[in-house]
Every structure is written in structure tokens, then in C-alpha cells.
Amino acid sequence: MTELVFILDRSGSMSGLEADTIGGFNSMIARQKQAAGEALVSTVLFDNDSTVIHDRLPLSEVPPLTEKEYFTRGCTALLDAVGGAIHHIGNIHKYARREDVPEKTLFIITTDGYENASCRYNYETVRRMIQRQKEKYGWEFLFLGANIDAAREAARFGIGADRSVNYKCDEAGTALNYEVISEAVCSVRAARPLSADWKRRIDEDVQKRGR
């Protein structure tokens, strides 16, 4: 069993990429439904606020994302989205029977801008939370950022440069993002180590087309 947590930016700066984000996410989920193994899916959409649209749903029961859920507005309260999700999933694991705790937990964080609106969590708190979950429980975190220095921003969250990548925030870049995310999720679900070149295709795209 794998715990999958998607933290998706829907702030105002994502305007114009709604259809690409929805299509990319749905294609990724469809591919995961064809892969072997069980998974639980949580999806958090964030702008000024965080909205949980899937709360540990069995993968087979995850409905398609639509424009009713994914629409752009507001600012970027990324720390609140990440901190709230870690707290929620961590508490469930803490009080669950050992046999009910998923063997693997993977967070995928996608943002096209810097944090600018959180009021419940700060960098230090979230960094400590992430470091604890990585070191004590082996959780994995991937950070995909556009229009920012993704490695530097990920470091502020306690996520290493090898788990962060800059992507091109356009139609092609968004589609590629979800293809690469799907490949990474497949590796984690198959209990294969996430290789250092998991992000190679995104890096090559940015080198070719720029940020």
C-alpha cells in the first residue's frame, strides 16, 4: 500500500493552464489505476486557502478532476497546504494499527510561485515536520516549481535538491510534469528506489526551452 498526497497550486497565476492541469492530473491517475498495487490518494488544492478534494480515497475510487474543483484564484498559501496535509496524514498513521499504515508515503508538491499567504504554518515548522517524517518514517517528498528557484525554495522546506526540479509553466511543460510525476509514483509504488534521474526529462525541457 502506498500513501499518495498531491499538493496542487490553483492560485491566480495558474490562470490559463486550468485545462492542462486537469488533463494532466487525470491522465496520471488513469495510468496509476492500471498499475499493480494498492494506493490511497489525497489531493489538496491551494490558493489563499486549502481545499481537500480527495481524502485518502482508494486509487480505484478517485473521480476525474473537473473545472468545478480546479479553478484559479487568490494567492499562494503553500506552507499551510503542506503543513496541514502532513499533520493530517501523520495523525492518521500515528493512531492506526501498524498493519493499516501504508508501507510508503509520497508527497508531490507543485507550485508556480513563491509562498506569500500562509497564516498557520511557517518555514521552520514545516521544515521540521518534513525532516521528521523523512528520517523517522521514510516519507518521500518531491517539489516541482515554476517561475522560482525550485531547489532553493525546496531547501527551505527541508527537501533536497535531488527531489526538486524547475519546470516550464506552459501547456507542454504541464503535460510533461504529470508524465514524469506518474513515472516517479510508479517507481515508489513498485518499491524501487527513486533514481537521481527521475527529473531528467523536465530538466532537459527547461534547458531546451527555458523557464
Identify the role of each PLM range.
Residues 1-211:
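Acidic, low-complexity intrinsically disordered regions
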